[in-house]
Design a protein with these regions (language model features):
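Polar, low-complexity loop segments and adjacent catalytic/binding residues used for recognizing
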Residues: 2-268
Length: 268
């Protein structure tokens, strides 16, 4: 465990046999927005939820089953299956400028741990870092493997889907859209639950303290992520990158930034 905990999000997932899996998200969160936009200033924020009272005063929005506890945030409700949750920064962030066409760059660094409650607990679906419309809202049909990101397009009732760009940390293979050959991966998602680019991870990788960095390079129009396993240390990092123009893919000028997670009713 880290001695200094800056931000901690927690979610719990369960299988049909009622064996819970606890996913402790975000020990450390830092977001820096570099703005090259007219009438815009750079933005940065971080939170240390281990300090009493910081969580209560944090400018964060909680959606659906996410909830603030004393020193952490639970993204999903472990007591029931098919739970979803989102937590987003309370203010809009400026992605691009209509008059000039310029797009902002940013970086987000965070550390998290995924810890099974028992040694034989099955893996849940995972979590994601997302960008979407502001004010943020909760998808109505994005449970299980949809990671509370994008509505299930196999449901005819879901005619439209909110524009969303994300980096997913996927801990469970869904045969309908996840890549073959691996049960765990990181991916870049652009308006679709099927990742535009993925990097496979070893089975059982999401077990221990991990550090992640998500970076958008506006000049290169590239969204990339790096994931390291900190405990135990010494393993090489895993990276994923995709070409994404945040303006051209439909994200608004004023966007929401946050994290999402969902669980299903797992059957082994």
């Amino acid at each position: 465990m880290l001695k200094t905990l800056h931000v901690r999000f927690m979610a719990k997932v369960m299988k049909r046999a009622k064996c819970p899996l606890v996913l402790s998200f975000l020990y450390l969160l830092q977001v820096i927005w570099w703005c090259c936009l007219p009438q815009a200033t750079s933005l940065s924020f971080d939170y240390d939820f281990s300090v009493p009272g910081v969580l209560a005063g944090a400018d964060l929005r909680y959606m659906n089953d996410s909830a603030a506890l004393q020193d952490r945030i639970e993204l999903t409700n472990y007591s029931r299956s098919w739970s979803t949750g989102r937590v987003a920064y309370g203010k809009a962030v400026r992605l691009w400028d209509e008059s000039t066409g310029k797009v902002a760059s940013f970086t987000s660094n965070f550390a998290f741990a995924i810890t099974p409650a028992t040694s034989n607990s099955a893996r849940g679906d995972g979590m994601a870092f997302f960008l979407g419309p502001y004010p943020p809202s909760m998808p109505t049909d994005a449970r299980g493997g949809h990671l509370a990101l994008i509505n299930n397009r196999d449901n005819p009732a879901n005619k439209d889907s909110t524009r969303t760009v994300a980096v997913e940390f996927d801990a469970f293979k869904n045969a309908g859209w996840d890549p073959d050959g691996t049960n765990c991966h990181i991916g870049v998602n652009v308006n679709d639950i099927r990742s535009a680019e993925t990097t496979a991870l070893p089975d059982g990788f999401f077990n221990g303290i991990m550090s992640a960095s998500v970076r958008y390079d506006a000049q290169a129009a590239t969204l990339s992520a790096t994931l390291r396993l900190d405990d135990p240390p010494g393993q090489s990092p895993y990276t994923v990158s995709a070409n994404v123009d945040l303006r051209n893919v439909g994200l608004p000028q004023e966007a929401a930034v946050g994290f999402s997670a969902s669980i299903g009713d797992l059957v082994e």
